[in-house]
Amino acid sequence: VVKQAMKLAREAVAGTDTLVALDIGPLGQLLEPTGTLKFEEAYELFKEIIDAGKSMADLIVIETMTDLYEIKAALLAAKENSSLPVFTYMTFEKNGRTFTGCSPAAMALTLEGLGADAVGVNCSLAPSELREIVKEISEWTTLPLVIKANAGLPDPITNEYSVSAEQFAEDYRFFAELGVKIYGGCWGTSPEYIVKVREMLRENPPKKRE
């Protein structure tokens, strides 16, 4: 599955300068001591994915993680079994921590120490709800920062998300001021959202972090 997915991605970007990422998410099992999956088993599962896709990838993205222990296993597997840049993102709750209780500061310090090439948040919340979380990450790492927020929450009747493309881009101004380097979107976003963000960034280039 991984090899075929990477092959299709390569075919889709042929003739362009678009980069292809080997995207890795959670395994779907909790690691010990919260769950039953051993750290070594998680490492081997991530290694299998990396070995299958690294030859066709320009970088590795590890995202939507809630457990610092699991993202540690994934990052170590990536760093020890490839020479590709590795971007690492976790997803946070409204209380400012991940589902398993990891703080933005702990995430930033740990992942930089393990050799990540960029850190950030994806999925999680709307842009306006991620301000303090990303700000805290920025205070604890010198790595490039990434944001891929949700477009708010979907309406249970219409299934439309609460943050429009225009508002999404406007809310991203905060992160440009903060010096976030890489921008994207998660649940509820579409190419229209990315176009609006790009237009905003042309007018408001990300500030250089000190």
What are these regions, as identified by a protein language model?
Residues 1-210:
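Domain-level signal for soluble alpha/beta catalytic cores
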